[in-house]
């Protein structure tokens, strides 16, 4: 069954002191008021989403609220693109509005937004959609003394768990693996077997002889095949363990997911199947258990 990748964001409310805010409101009362105001935005047929052009005129982005169920709203938002077409030796500008899906979860304890990543919508940059929505929400919320901050969720990952989940659960394939090999002389505490240590010294020696800044090994395959990366293989497991423990890098290039590096934190994402809204509600966002929100990340 076809799946679509969504990037997960977490939102929170900030109380702004102004004429519309009661200063004696408790924190709980303020948050409840913010949630009530925010939820009411999705009772209409669309949101007021726009961005000012360089000349100051607004560029509006078409959107449509498709459905709301149990505090979860599914909407679609369009990009605005001008393309040049040539016909009969004449160039004409043509407007096109590719769209992507957005799911907003206002349920207590969830407070998150999922944005579909499509390469032809805002060039696949979901943060641009986040910024547009954040501005649209704040134009309304600020009247009631609130602002909303929407930030990416960061997924806490284990290397082998991530690879296994992507290959077996998401049916992804691996087209390339790049492993950075360290100079063993720079890390006297490198805990590895004599055979592995000799191999690392050989790679380091070749790098020095060729005046290379670093040493890597590249593993790749053809378009119709996939590389195998399994924990059962002792030598492979040992190499991955070295990379993870000592801060060296192993990069796995998936065909769908893109590159996953052992040293990097991952953005929380979710692969949705056909019925987007039902899938969202029924699966109850189990990914939430494996994700954390960093207040210093995103913006």
Which residues make up each language-model segment?
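Terminal interaction module
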Residues: 1-80, 120-299
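Long, hydrophobic/aromatic-enriched structural stretches that serve as scaffold segments
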Residues: 64-121
């Amino acid at each position: 069954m076809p799946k679509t990748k969504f990037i997960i964001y977490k939102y929170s409310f900030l109380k702004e002191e102004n004429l519309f805010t009661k200063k004696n409101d408790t924190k709980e009362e303020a948050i409840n008021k913010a949630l009530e105001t925010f939820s009411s935005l999705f009772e209409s047929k669309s949101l007021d989403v726009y961005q000012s052009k360089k000349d100051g005129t607004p560029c509006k982005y078409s959107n449509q609220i498709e459905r709301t169920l149990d505090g979860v709203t599914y909407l679609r938002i369009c990009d605005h693109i001008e393309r040049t077409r040539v016909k009969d030796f004449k160039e004409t500008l043509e407007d096109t509005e590719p769209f992507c899906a957005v799911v907003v979860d206002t349920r207590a304890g969830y407070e998150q937004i999922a944005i579909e990543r499509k390469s032809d919508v805002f060039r696949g940059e979901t943060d641009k959609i986040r910024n547009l929505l954040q501005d649209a929400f704040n134009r309304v919320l600020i009247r009631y003394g609130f602002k909303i901050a929407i930030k990416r969720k960061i997924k806490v990952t284990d290397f082998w768990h991530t690879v296994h989940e992507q290959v077996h659960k998401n049916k992804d394939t691996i087209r390339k693996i790049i492993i950075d090999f360290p100079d063993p002389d720079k890390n006297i505490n490198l805990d590895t077997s004599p055979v592995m240590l000799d191999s690392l010294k050989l790679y380091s020696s070749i790098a020095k002889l060729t005046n290379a800044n670093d040493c890597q090994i590249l593993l790749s395959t053809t378009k119709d095949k996939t590389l195998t990366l399994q924990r059962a293989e002792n030598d492979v497991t040992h190499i991955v363990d070295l990379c993870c423990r000592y801060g060296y890098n192993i990069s796995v290039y998936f065909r769908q997911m893109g590159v996953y590096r052992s040293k990097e934190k991952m953005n929380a994402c979710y692969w949705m199947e056909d019925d987007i809204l039902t899938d969202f509600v029924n699966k109850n966002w189990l990914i939430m258990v494996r994700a954390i929100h960093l207040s210093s990340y995103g913006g």
